[in-house]
Each structure stands twice: as C-alpha cells, then as structure tokens.
Amino acid sequence: MVNHIRIFDNLFQSNISKFQNLTSKSYIIRNDNEKNSYLPMVQEIRELFGKEGEIFSKSIGTHPDFFGIENTNEYQYICSLFVDISGSTKLALKYSLDKVKLYKNAIISSAIEIFRAFDGHIHRIQGDAVLVYFGHKELEKSDAIINAINAASLMQYFNATTLKKFFESENLEPLKIRIGIDFGDDSSVLWSKYGIDGINEITSTSIHTDLASKFQNKAPSNKIMIGENINKYLDIPKKFRSIKIEKNNGVDVEKRYILNTNNLGRYSMEVFEWEKYLNSFSMLPPFSTENEQFYSPRDLKIRCWIIDEKNQDKYEYIERGSALKKEMNLLFKLEIYNQCLEFKNIKWRVVNYGEEAKKDKELEFEMNQYEGYQYCNQKTAYTGLHFMECYLYDINDKIICHDSFGLFINDNNREVRKLGIED
C-alpha cells in the first residue's frame, strides 16, 4: 500500500493548507483560484475504485433523497456508518486553540472527503464523531454496503499511515478510531422531520442507524464493527470477519451479540478485518513485501472485463468497486509489467465463498482449460465475495508468485434481519 500513502498524505496536507489560508489576508484571492485544489486526491480514490461522475452529496444534513419531506414519512433503506475519532483532544495540551482547531478540522475534513469519495452523505458532525449515510434511491443496496466498508477500510488505513506519522512526529500518541456500520432495509428505515418550525432536521428513524453508533462504541481501537445485516446481505468470507474477545477475570470471553433479549432476540456483531481485506486486493500493493520478489500491482496484475455479448462490447470491472449481477460473462487477463518476471506456466483457480456456493459444492476448482494462457473466461453465479486466482510457475513447476482478484456478486434480493415492530 506504500504507493497509495501519497494520496492520503496529500489529502491531509491539503486540508491543513486550506484552513491555514482562512487566516491569511491573501485567502480570498487564493480561494478563488485554488478552492478545488484538494479534489484531485478525492478523484484519485474514486478512479481507483471505479467511481464515475460527480460525488453523490456535497452538503451536510438532510439526505438529498428527502429534501422535499414536510409533514410526511417515507421508507427507504440506508447503510449507516458512525465513526469516532478519539485522541485529538491531546493536541490541546501542546498547542494553542487556533492550532488545535486547525489540526482537528483537517482530520475531520479528510475523513469527510474519504467518505464522500465513496458517495457517502455526511449527515451530522458531533464533535470528533461523524454520522454518514451510504445509499440512495438510484443505488443498489449491495453497492451502498460495499461503499461503506471500502470507505471505512480506507479511513482506518489513513489513520494507520498518514495520521499515525503526523502524531508521532508531534511526539503524541496516535489517534484511536472506531467505526460502526449497519444496514436497515426499506421497511426498517423511516425518514421524517424532527423538531419544530425553523428548528428541525430530516433524519432516519431506525434501530439500525442507532446500532451503527453502538457498534462504533463496541469496536476495538482502530477497528471496524459490522452488524449482522452487513454480512447477511454481502455474505462476507469468514477470513475477513472475527468475533470480539474481551478479558473477564483473566479468561477470554466472546462478545457475539449487540442485542440478546427475549423480546428482540439476538442480533450479532463482528469485527471486520480491514487490514486483511485491503491486503487481498490485486490493485493495491501488499502491506509488506519483505518476502515477495514479485507482487501486484507493481510487477503483475489481474484485470477483469464484463462481456456484453448482445452489444458485442466489454466494460472493465474495477475490483470490488460494486457488485455484479449473476449470470454475467467475465474475461480475466493477467498483465505482466516486470520484464524480469520469467515463468514457464500459468494456472487459474476459482475460490468461491458463501452459502450459495457451499450448497452447490462449488467452493474451489481449477480452470484447467486455460492452463498456460494469460487469460480465462468465467461466469458469475453465487452471492458473495469470490476470487479468481492466478499462479505463475518456473521450469521446475514451482510457484514463482501469484495474484488474486476479488469480486462481489449480488442479486440484491437478500433476506436481512428486521428488528422491532413494523408498521
């Protein structure tokens, strides 16, 4: 991931510079010419994950889908993300209030830009915490959840790299960032106006929005806690999920549930392993290359295209930028960038996860008909996050290196938990 640290370093530094300019006499001139100077970093993130067009939301408060609500109620799904940034108050022990405000604002603003890069809507800033909505009426539910976990993962990566480096350079302990995410389906999220004339807001009423905040509070430091519905909708591989462990009188105790009551039943929570998740991308460099002579995307990379047979065309699918529908024809290609990477043979392997693939006993299989070729064809079939793997062998049939390409598949017809009483 070393190459991508630059994006976050530039994003954070640009926000510091931007807010420093607010106190400068030359700000008005500079602002007219450079008010969008920080946007290229956001655009880089969007392009990296295949996001096209303008960002979804450029405002805070009311979700753009519900500007017209007056004295009515509307039901519509949402994926809620709550992030809390603790540790920034220690800045006040070392700096003047002006400088504390500068750094805190740069941290919050950088977080906002990361969430907006994935089409998140900033609903509320609460001190060092931010409530973000992912999803809107034109977006598939699976894509809203994918956007949320991708944004949350990069937010934690931003903290583990750029912000950690900054705080250590100031001889301060790094920040502790906790993120909670949950999903409420259409019938479980009510949008309406709260308050009185002139003092009101349009917001969501949903236990799943409330639980996002609870999950944040339950998350270990610098981790992401996801609700049961997140996994139910995407069917995330177990290798990217874990049960929170707490010590009780020296004994490890599993904390599986956020709710465990007779009237509401059980509702589970799990830690989303964002480091493992990001490290499994073909398009992102690994966290460590110490034992790797060749690795993606520096020396090689798998790319994927959706084949549109009807229109005799193809469109590139950016890894895990969105979910693919079932029964889509795909073309995978291995691109070699390092001329020193000499190999004798290539083998392709499909690794599926999830209940649907398990039921059909199609979890892993070799693509033998494409042995020796730098491409292979496959079709989407099962809900979940699946991988196409490619292995390169030397003349002695020993593995030189390998790469894997992850893709989400979802028919957006998933059953999720509906807590509470429906109207």
UniProtKB/Swiss-Prot annotation:
Spans annotated as AGS-C domain: 290-409
Organism: Staphylococcus aureus
Record remark on domains: Has an N-terminal nucleotide cyclase domain and a C-terminal nucleotide sensor domain (AGS-C).
Sequence similarity: Belongs to the adenylyl cyclase class-4/guanylyl cyclase family. Pyrimidine cyclase subfamily.
Binding site for Mn(2+) 2: D84, I85, D128
UniProt xrefs under InterPro entries: A/G_cyclase, AGS_C, Nucleotide_cyclase
UniProt-recorded name of the protein: Cytidylate cyclase
GO biological process: one example: cyclic nucleotide biosynthetic process
Domain of life: Bacteria
Cofactor(s) it depends on: Mn(2+)
Assigned keywords, A-Z: Antiviral defense, Cytoplasm, Lyase, Manganese, Metal-binding, Nucleotide-binding
